[in-house]
Amino acid sequence: MWVIYIISKKQLLTHPGQYRLPTSIKCIGYVFCAIFYFKGLFIKPKDSFGKRLTDCFYDLGPIYIKFGQTLSTRPDLIGIEVAENLKYLQDKLPPFDTKIVHEKIESKFGKKISDLFTKFDEKPVAAASIAQVHKAQLKNGDIVAVKILRPDISEKYERDMQFLEFGAKIVSTLIKKAKRLKPKEVIAVFRQSMKFELDLRSEAAAASRLYDNFINDDSLLIPKIYWELTSSDIITLEWVEGVSIYDKDKIIKLGLDPKEAAAKIAVIFFNQAYRD
């Protein structure tokens, strides 16, 4: 019901922007509006469809934020205007309680935080849709990043994926032109990628393999994995300072050439493809 309420509030089915929806879909949209957002029957949205879709994903939470980010990479499927809006979909959410962080770590590894770390920052350095990251120091002095999945994220993932799969079936059935976009296949691929993200052992294994492949290559630094402090919902890895690839000003301030950096990234990408 919450999903339908948000879709109705954003008027996605009644005012779909540049998209031409079948009359049957629009009628369903108006019925939803009448039930969940009555005033939407009498007012037109001020924002573009792309902006409203972005807001909708954000309001619906972690899995939808990830799905929106995935869609943003496919302007060929959803159109340039919508893709550009979805690029601004921030993967940032309020952090969950540090008490829960302590409980998860201590129950998983059978030791108190104080026995595992010399320092453990209570405030996360990043809180995203799937997990949050805390900076810490091990007993041997190593500075590490500890990434912990959000509580109940796996249950929310399964619930939200079932709704997305249901939505894909509806779209495939009612919108004939949408079949060529293969919505059910898109959701299936998304399910697989999310399955990978929700098991941090997979992320750790991929990082370890990459570390081995680039061990004699100084063009790329892969953080070391601390396997003794890694599980399906917690990963501990070497702390590495860095700058976002999107922060062009900081990159230039560091004395780097953005074009040269982009070229190196391209080479690294192809090296991964050939080495793996």
Regions found by a protein language model. Name each.
Residues M1-Q272:
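Broad phosphate/nucleotide-binding scaffolds in NTP-utilizing and phosphate-metabolizing enzymes
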Residues R275-D276:
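Catalytic-loop of the protein kinase fold
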